[in-house]
Amino acid sequence: MERATGPGSLARTLLLPLLLGLVAGTVTARRTSDLLAPTAEAAFGLGAAAAPTSATRVPATGAVIAAEVTVEDSEALPAAAGEQEAREPEPEPEEEPDIRPCGRSLVIISTLDGRIAALDPENHGKKQWDLDVGSGSLVSSSLSKPEVFGNKMIIPSLDGDLFQWDRDRESMETVPFTVESLLESSYKFGDDVVLVGGKSLTTYGLSAYSGKVRYICSALGCRQWDNDEMEQEEDILLLQRTQKTVRAVGPRSGNEKWNFSVGHFELRYIPDMETRAGFIESTLKPSGNKEQSKIISDVEEQEAVMMDTVIKVSVADWKVMAFNKKGGHLEWEYQFCTPIASAWLVKDGKVIPISLFDDTSYAPNDGVLEDEEDIVEAARGATENSVYLGMYRGQLYLQSSVRISEKFPTSPKALESVSSENAIIPLPTIKWKPLIHSPSRTPVLVGSDEFDKCLSNDKFSHEEYSNGALSILQYPYDNGYYLPYYKRERNKRSTQITVRFLDNPNYKNIRKKDPVLLLHWWKEIVGTIVFCIVATTFIVRRLFHPHPHRQRKESETQCQTENKYDAVSGEANDSSWNDIKNSGYVSRYLTDFEPIQCMGRGGFGVVFEARNKVDDCNYAIKRIRLPNRELAREKVMREVKALAKLEHPGIVRYFNAWLEAPPEKWQEKMDEIWLKDDSTDWPLSSPSPVDAPSVKIRRMDPFSTKECIEIIAPSPHSSRSFSVGISCSQTSSSESQFSPLEFSGMDHGNVSKSADAVCQLQDSCLTDCEGEDGTMDGNDEGHSFELCPSEASPYIRSRERTSSSIVFEDSGCDNASSKEEPRMNQPPVGNHYANKLSALRHSGSKSSEPTVSVSPSRPTTLSLDLTKSSVGKLQPSSPKVYLYIQMQLCRKENLKDWLNSRCTIEARERSVCLHIFLQIAEAVEFLHSKGLMHRDLKPSNIFFTMDDVVKVGDFGLVTAMDQDEEDQMVLTPMPGYARHTGQVGTKLYMSPEQIHGNSYSHKVDIFSLGLILFELLYPFGTQMERVRILTDVRDLKFPPLFAQKYPREYAMVQDMLSPSPTERPEAASIIENAIFEDLEFPEKTLLRQRSRSMSSPGAKHSRHSSSPHSPLPSN
C-alpha cells in the first residue's frame, strides 16, 4: 500500500497547481468580459439577454449604435480604423481600474472615423483606452462629385456650415445657409429635388479612466449596464454626439441625388459625489441657437497646460504632441491613423478644450536651431489659421476655429432668394491663399512604421495620401491647406508672444552658421563693387542730371512738330528722292490747298494757314502725326469728333478732316520743296547744301535758365555775319511764352540766307531744342544768328548795318505775323524776304536803331553741324500717318496774349472785358447743353476771329497728346454728376476736385470761368505776381482793390470759385446775371486795336498790327 500510495500522492501533488491555474483562468476571462462594452442588441433589448464577450460592429440603422472598448497596454499599437482583431489585455491589479489616482489627467481625442481615444499625458502619451461607438464617421458627403454641381463644389464643415468652392474663379465662399437651415426650410428644394433628413443627438456615459460604457441615451431611449456594480466615486465622462444628415431625392423617382452628413462630439466631465467642487461645465450647452453652438471660441480658448507640459495638436499630421514649456523640446507624441476632429484635456476635474489651430510652435531640443532667424520663424504664432481644408476617404471637409459664417445671417428662405435674379445676399469670402501645412515643399516623407501600418489598413487614406485625390489638393505630400483669417477681420488676440534670447537656457545650444571665407575671391568682389559704383553713377547722372544744354522746361507754345525729319545734309540721297517722286503718291492737302504760312507749332503738331484753291478763302489747317498705338490714336481723334458735332458762334468752326499716309520720307522731302518755293508767302525756306548752317547751343549764365543757340552759316561771298537771338527762357507759370526773336543783320544781301537758316533751325532744332552732336565750325566768316543772347552782352551800334526784329508772340517757330512795310533807309533787295525782315520789330522795343548781338565764348558748347550726312541715317520706326483738320481761321493772338499786352487797369475797359467773358460763358453754356464739358478752359484756349468774335477752341488735343494714361475724353458725356477722376487740364485753372482726383462734373468749367473773369478785370505786372495772386484767389483770398472796384463781379466770382461744386452757379444763370444787362456793348470795341488779317482774292495775305502792345512805325 505504501508503494501504491507513494506514486499517487506524487501525482496529486502535481495536478493540484494545474487545477488551481485553470480556475484562475476562468475567473480572469469573466472579469475581462465584464470590461467589454455591450452591443446594440443588449443595449436596447433587440433580442440579446446579455452583452456578448467580444465586440462586434453592427451597421447603424436609425439610432442603433454599437460600441467597442479596447484597453491598451504599454506594448499595444494604436488601433486602426475598422480593426477587428481580438485584443487580450494584460492582467492588471484588481484595484487599478476602480481606484482613480489623485490628480490623474487624460487627453481625450475624437477622430473623424467616430472613435474616441484617451491618452495618458503623464505616461508619455500612452493610450489608456479606445472606444468605437459604431455609428460611422463624422463626415460623409457626395457633394464633391463634379456631376452634382458642375464646376462648383459644396464642402461641408464639421460644425454644420457649408462652403462653396468655385473651380473657375478659385474662390471659397460661405453658402448663406447651414444644415439646420436646410432642415428648417421647405421640403421641396426647387422643382426636382426634395430634401429629407434630420438631426440626431446621442449621449454616452463613459467611465473616465477605464473607458467602460455605463449608459447610452438617444431618441429611442436609454440603456444602462452594471448599475449594481457601478461605484459612486468613479468619475464619468459625458460624451454627446450631434449628427446632421441631409439627403436630396427626386420627387418622382425617389432616387437619391446627393447627400451629406456631418457630426461632432462634445465632452463634459462629471466628477464623483465627493468632489463636486471641481465640477465645471463645458463651454458648450446643447441648443439649437447657432450663437450658442460654439465648441471653441477665440476668447474662450486657453492653452492646455499641465504642470510644465503643453499639449498641442497637429491637424494636418494627425499627431498629439507634448512640449516642455520651459525648454520647448518635444517630450512625447502620438500618431493617429485618421484625422483628429476634437481634443480635450481632463485635468483636476476640468475639461479644457485643446485648440486645433494654435500656430505657436515649440522646437524640439534635439533639432538644433541654425540661427536666431530660425527661432523667430519658429515662434511666429501670433495669429491663428481659421479654416483647415482636409480630406478623409476621398471626401473634402473643413474645420474652423473662428465661425466666419456667424457674421452673416442665415435664413431658411436663402435657397429661394438665391435663385431669384433681384436678390442681393452678401456672401462671405475666404481668400484663397492656402498655406500648406508642411514647412517645406521638398517631397520628403519621414518614415514612420506606425503611420505606414495605418495606411496599409485603410485604402482610402493610402490613395488620398499618395495622389491627393481631387484637384484642390494636387501636391502629393500635403494632407490639407490652411486658409488664414486676417487680423483686420477679427478682434485682436489677448495672447502676446515674446521671444527672449538671453533668458532662454537653450540659447547656448544655438549653432552659429559657419562663416564663408571669401578672401580668395577678393579680386572678383572688388571688381564687382567698382562696376556697380560706376554703373550707378552713370545711370543717376543720365536720369537725374541731364546735360545742361537740354535742361529746358516745355511750354505750351513750345516749338514742337510731329514731322521731325532729318536736317538737310550736305549730300542728299538723290536715288531715294527719285523713288519717292516715282511712287505716284498724291497729297490731298497739296491738291486742294496752297500753303501760305506757319501759324504755330506746339504739342499738338503744326498749324498752317492755307488758301483753298476752289473757293479762294483762307483756312487754318492742323497737321498732326497720329501715334502708332491705337488707344493714343483714338485720343487724338477726339477733337475731330467733338468739333464736328458743335455749331455755335462762340466755338471754332469745323469744316473737314482727312488722313494721309505718305510713303517713307515723302513728307520730309515735300517740306523741303515747300520751304524752297518762293511763290508762296512762306517765311520758312531751306538753305542750300553748301550754305547749310551749323548750330551752337550755349548756356549764357550758369545761374540763368536761358540757353543760347548760335547758328553759323558759312558764306564764300561775304565776310560779315548775321546774328539772330531767341530767348528760350520760361517763366515759372504754366502759361509762359517765349521771349521775342531778334534779328540783326550785317548785309542786306544775305538776309534771305539768314532767314533760310532760321527756318531750317525751327524745323529741325527748335522742335525740342535738341540736335545731333557735331563739331563747331571754326570759320569766322559766314552768316550766323544766335538764340537767347545774354542780357549782359554789349550792343554795338553800327551805321553800316541795318537791323530788324521778328516777333514770335505764340510760338518760337512762327515768324509769319510779319507784314510787308517799306522802310526809308532800307535799300532794295532782290529777294522778297528782305522786305519781310525789315518790317518786323520786337513788340516791346521803343527804338529802331540797329543792334548786333555779341555772344562771348563759353566752355559748355554744343555745336550741331548740319552739313554732316550722319544725321540723315536716322530711320523712322514705323510708317507715319498724318491727320489734317480744316477749320476756321483765327488770329494768332489768343486771350492770353491779349491780357499780357494790357498790364494796367486803365488798358482794360470794364465793358470790353465783360463782353469777352460773356461770349466765353455763352460757348460754355452751349457745351453744357450738349451734355459735354471742356475741362481745360484757360486764356490760351480762347481765340479771336478776324471780326473780333471770341472763339473757344483746343478741345482736348493737347491733353490727348500729353497725357497718355488718361482714358477719358476732355469733352466727356455729362449724365448729371458723372464720376470723373482724371486729372486733366492746367492746374492753375483746374478745380479742387480735379486736382485731388475726386469725382467731378461740368461744374469744373464754372470754376475755370471764375478765374478767367478775375484775370480779365485784374491785370498783373509780372508772371510771378500773376501766379501768386491767382493761387490766393483759388482759396478765395481776393486783393482789396478788386473787391472795392468791382463789388458785383467780386460776389459773382466768389460763387463761381466755391469749393463745393453744388454751390457754383450754372452757365445759364451766369449769362443772365444782372451785371450784363446795364452794359452797352459797342459794335466795334477796343478789340480792333489788336492785330487783324485782311485778305482779298488774287492778292497775297498780309497781317497788319496796330495794337499798342506792338507799335510799329508807319513809314
From Swiss-Prot:
Residues 74-101, 807-832, 841-860, 1087-1115 are annotated as: Disordered. The modification Phosphotyrosine is found at residue 619. Residues 845-860 have a biased composition (Polar residues). SMART domains: S_TKc. It is a single-pass type I membrane protein. Its EC number is 2.7.11.1, 2.7.10.2. Keywords: ADP-ribosylation, ATP-binding, Endoplasmic reticulum, Glycoprotein, Kinase, Membrane, Nucleotide-binding, Phosphoprotein, Serine/threonine-protein kinase, Signal, Stress response, Transferase, Translation regulation, Transmembrane, Transmembrane helix, Tyrosine-protein kinase, Unfolded protein response. It comes from the Eukaryota. InterPro entries: CC_SR_Kinase (IPR050339), Kinase-like_dom_sf (IPR011009), Prot_kinase_dom (IPR000719), Quinoprotein_ADH-like_sf (IPR011047), Ser/Thr_kinase_AS (IPR008271), WD40/YVTN_repeat-like_dom_sf (IPR015943). GO terms for cellular component: cytoplasm; endoplasmic reticulum membrane; mitochondria-associated endoplasmic reticulum membrane contact site; nucleus. Inhibited by HSPA5/BIP in absence of stress. Perturbation in protein folding in the endoplasmic reticulum (ER) promotes reversible dissociation from HSPA5/BIP and oligomerization, resulting in trans-autophosphorylation and kinase activity induction. Inactivated following phosphorylation at Thr-802 by AKT (AKT1, AKT2 and/or AKT3). Inhibited by ATAD3A at mitochondria-endoplasmic reticulum contact sites, providing a safe haven for mitochondrial protein translation during ER stress. ATP binds at residues 599-607, 622. The chain crosses the membrane at residues 515-535. It is an enzyme of class 2 (transferase). It catalyses: L-seryl-[protein] + ATP = O-phospho-L-seryl-[protein] + ADP + H(+); L-threonyl-[protein] + ATP = O-phospho-L-threonyl-[protein] + ADP + H(+); L-tyrosyl-[protein] + ATP = O-phospho-L-tyrosyl-[protein] + ADP + H(+). Residues 1-29 form the signal peptide. One of its GO terms (biological process) is endoplasmic reticulum unfolded protein response. Residues 30-514 are extracellular. Belongs to the protein kinase superfamily. Ser/Thr protein kinase family. GCN2 subfamily. This is Eukaryotic translation initiation factor 2-alpha kinase 3. It comes from Bos taurus.
